[in-house]
């Protein structure tokens, strides 16, 4: 039973683990969608409620598994209690039997004691009779004492045997009583343990009831959360419909704004043409007056040649206007040059910071172009945190080709900032989930507003530049229009500076996070390099030790081979010596046998 409970407890957490994995995957997908399309507070609230629901469901599952385990343990304890109660009943029955046996034995002991007392009294009476008999024998002639004492001694022996048997029975009964007392003590202990287990079971039942109440409360909370979720879903649907309507209205307003701006541009072009025509008329009048004066003065003498005062005043006024216009143009050009130089310096500094931040992690540099491609292939609505779509909508008649380089640099910086943001999301998670999405939604809104303002400012600058080009050909402007232009340019520069400062702050934060991530990666790489160096040192030491051992083994093998060769040489020498000895022995024996035979033949010859 306990093994089954443990298996249930071990298998139960697998479901929540899978749910956690799915929750993390869904959260990552929601964060990616929030990054691409912006985040709404309603969506954030919905995700939070869904997370709470999942947590409650997980807690419910855990509580149910605990309840099942407790129920199984309760059943096991109930079975154990039932078994203990059965054993207790059996022990009580045995106790009753032993008590009845003890009572019967006690009665028998009392009877034996009474019989013993009676036997002692009979013994005393017999002794008294013996004394009387002895006294009577002295007086009278009586039968022999042995005849009287024999039956009495036989009775005494029988009584003593019965007394010994009764004493043995008493000892056995004492042993049985001691055993029963020990069994009673064990039974009392088991009863106490059973009572403690029963108390534990009662406590567990109380805990189960509390858990059931908590489960009911959780069910009610889940129902309330379901209702709230349904309400939030309905509100989200309504809000999504209103958002769609507002988007359609914004699109319509953008189209109308584009049309209005086209008309304004056309009117401005017509006004510029009118001003150029007026300038050309003034120049034509001046030239005509000069020609008329020249023609009129041809027939006069050199002393009589005079220019009329009106013509001289008109020419003077015309030249003063052109000089003032040129001065205003010089001032505007100086201002634009200064602002462009400042912007150039700022952009160069920011590009250096970006390059320093992007050069650090090689993985980040390899990921950036792929992400840029995905952004360029995808919808260009939030390419620069919500403002690129409005930029593309504001130029339906081919105005994208006429934009200034500052706008191009701004759009490239915004796209690079979005890429850096996305890369920083993958490398360093330095912000929390909910606050990050809310901050990003705020940043998207502000960035879109500021970039829309910057696009309007760029278009105003373009119209001003075109107007200046036409004025270089010969337009005359008043000082009020010049002051208005300077005010517009300062406002546009301020808006551009606001956008650049906003992007600079964002990029600076991302650069700091990237530098931190790079520093952490460098530290991890250094640690890995140190570990690799340590392993390489260990490998070198092991290889050296292996080489030393191999050299030792080779030396030992060479020594063994030398010893074996020496042993072989010794054996060969011994074999050769034995062979030589055997060959010498055979030769000497042959010589001796030959000499013996010759001597014998000589002796025989001499004998003959």
Swiss-Prot record:
Alphabetized UniProt keyword annotations: Coiled coil, Cytoplasm, Cytoskeleton, Microtubule
Coiled-coil segments: 40-346, 542-576
Is Coiled coil set as a keyword in this record?
Answer: yes
Compositional bias per record (Polar residues), positions renumbered to this chain:
363-379, 476-493
Keyword Coiled coil tagged? yes
The listed locations are: Cytoplasm, Cytoskeleton
**Its GO biological process terms?**
cytoskeleton organization
An annotated GO cellular component: cytoplasm
Q: What GO terms are given for molecular function?
A: microtubule binding
Main localization is cytoplasm
- Annotated stretches, region: Disordered: 1-23, 354-493, 570-608
Query: Which intervals carry biased composition (Low complexity)?
Result: 402-421, 586-608
Q: Where is this region: Required for targeting to microtubules?
A: 224-458
Function, as annotated = Plant-specific protein that interact with microtubules.
Give the UniProt family note.
Answer: Belongs to the MAP70 family.
UniProt name for this protein: Microtubule-associated protein 70-3
What is this protein's gene name? MAP70.3
